């Protein structure tokens, strides 16, 4: 047993495409159950849980992420990128996550009360994640961090994710 870690404080869209390199991926970012507009001629709206990144939108990044932006797997929020559940399903299609366990500390990962939305976890699971855990509604960082530490420490001791969360 043991734990080797890699901490990335400035996660980019490209970084999120490399989660298959890890047995356990922790998403520590802001999240939102967000309504956004898309379309040029006929405006449409969609509401979905998203993970907000600090990566700024610029000309070159927009070119690099062009297909994801056009398909709304990546959207722009206040000049930065955010990813939707479809992003993970596409990035890891064919099961490329290969059994990675994903723990999310983001707010509204599963939507909010009255509007539970599994789009992010569905994308991760369809991409081959072994298990996904996250929160509905807002979550205080102190609470999510203590839950995360307890869960990870119990998994290091040999418990399954379900056993660690049930504790």
Please name every model-derived segment:
Residues 101-167:
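Active-site-proximal C-terminal subdomain of hydrolase catalytic domains
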Residues 1-37:
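Functional beta-strand-loop-alpha-helix junction segments that form "active/interaction loops"
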Residues 10, 57, 136-137:
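Proline- and acidic/polar-enriched loop/turn elements at helix boundaries
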Residues 32-41, 140, 145-148:
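Generic preference for flexible, low-structure residues
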Residues 34-131:
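Cysteine protease catalytic core and zymogen-processing segment of caspase-like enzymes
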